[in-house]
């Protein structure tokens, strides 16, 4: 089969074309199929960039939805949701890509080139992984880069955007290629397509890009984490960057409203609330210790000690049960009402409460476990029901 002409390689802004069907194959699993064309504006998945999506319209007006696109041995296959009788070799198919989808990928891919090139020139970092995800672009470097370094690179990358320099596509000869310094993640056979962004990057790439860097709009690094000796970046460009900044501003406004603080003062307000919370937590811990000591003092040595205390968190339950088991060798339990029913912690000095815990979970729809001397969990029953169950089991 003849290879498919790739219109998108020469004009990434071309949205429509009319091609002829080379082959059409049904897919019995999905009820759809795949169609190969002699020329296409649809970009196939590859090089970290998702495939285009859109429609194919046959001569009789039948519209086929293209959900995915793949390349095999130079032939580009368009996955469609249905394969009507008119989809036969030689038939015309009018192509239309989802332009909003494509332009987003052009912004992300061009932005990735700019930032990767800047990171390479500033720090010698190699891009060893790249994927345009639904929310952000993932970029992996082979060396660690500091937060200060990433900030400097982000600023430099955006300066390239502000310069609105052309994104040049060339197809050098083997001789020209041998004299050219460019980035490439793998050995490439056949004609090499070089994407050059003056002042930023020279890279072998088959993807779609904006004609000028200004169309990228903005590059924003959202997150960075250490990954396999390098750093993994979460990056957004263009419309995604605008949406990310708008979302950040909305969250900041919400926090500011809650804390009665201006946008420029939210960090200080959060620190203040955190300090207050830490102080209250320390006070709460001390008051709980006093309460647990008082409850333990009420326990009769050798007798059971089951206490219901509202408002305890898992740590508080564990502390109370442990404290009770220090005061008596009987069965001890700390219970507190929660959204599921009851949080519990069962303990017994020198005993094994695992079988009892298992029985409680089975009887009261609970979950939990632990060590012989202490078990913890929750169940779908009121604290009073749990207390009654424990007392009956211990008779």
What residue ranges belong to the model's regions?
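A glycine- and charged-residue-rich anion-binding loop/surface
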Residues: 1-395
């Amino acid at each position: 089969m003849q290879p498919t002409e790739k219109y998108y390689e020469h004009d990434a802004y071309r949205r429509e074309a009319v091609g002829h069907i080379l082959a059409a194959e049904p897919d019995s699993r999905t009820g759809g199929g795949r169609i190969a064309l002699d020329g296409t504006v649809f970009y196939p998945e590859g090089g970290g960039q998702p495939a285009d999506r859109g429609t194919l319209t046959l001569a009789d007006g039948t519209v086929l939805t293209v959900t995915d696109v793949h390349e095999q041995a130079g032939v580009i296959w368009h996955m469609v949701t249905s394969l009507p009788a008119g989809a036969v070799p030689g038939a015309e198919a009018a192509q239309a890509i989802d332009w909003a989808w494509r332009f987003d990928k052009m912004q992300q891919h061009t932005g990735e080139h700019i930032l990767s090139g800047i990171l390479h020139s500033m720090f010698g970092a190699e891009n060893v992984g790249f994927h345009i995800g639904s929310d952000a672009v993932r970029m992996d470097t082979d060396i660690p880069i500091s937060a200060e370094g990433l900030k400097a690179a982000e600023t430099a990358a955006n300066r390239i955007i502000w310069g609105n320099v052309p994104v040049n596509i060339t197809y050098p000869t083997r001789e020209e290629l041998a004299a050219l310094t460019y980035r490439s993640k793998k050995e490439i056979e056949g004609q090499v397509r070089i994407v050059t962004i003056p002042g930023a990057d020279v890279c072998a790439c088959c993807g779609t890009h904006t004609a000028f860097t200004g169309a990228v709009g903005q590059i924003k690094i959202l997150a960075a984490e250490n990954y396999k000796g390098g750093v993994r970046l979460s990056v957004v460009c263009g419309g995604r960057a605008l949406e990310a900044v708008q979302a950040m501003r909305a969250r900041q406004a919400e926090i500011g409203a809650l804390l009665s603080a201006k946008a420029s003062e939210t960090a200080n307000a959060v620190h203040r609330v955190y300090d207050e919370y830490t102080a209250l937590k320390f006070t709460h811990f001390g008051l709980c210790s006093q309460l647990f000591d008082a409850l333990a003092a009420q326990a009769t040595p050798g007798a059971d000690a089951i206490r219901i205390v509202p408002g305890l968190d898992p740590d508080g339950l564990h502390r109370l049960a442990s404290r009770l088991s220090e005061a008596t060798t009987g069965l001890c339990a700390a219970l507190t009402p929660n959204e599921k029913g009851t949080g519990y912690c069962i303990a017994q000095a020198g005993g094994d409460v695992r079988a009892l815990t298992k029985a409680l979970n089975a009887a009261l729809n609970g979950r939990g476990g632990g060590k012989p001397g202490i078990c913890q969990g929750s169940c779908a029953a009121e604290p009073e029901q749990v207390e009654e169950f424990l007392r009956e089991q211990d008779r």
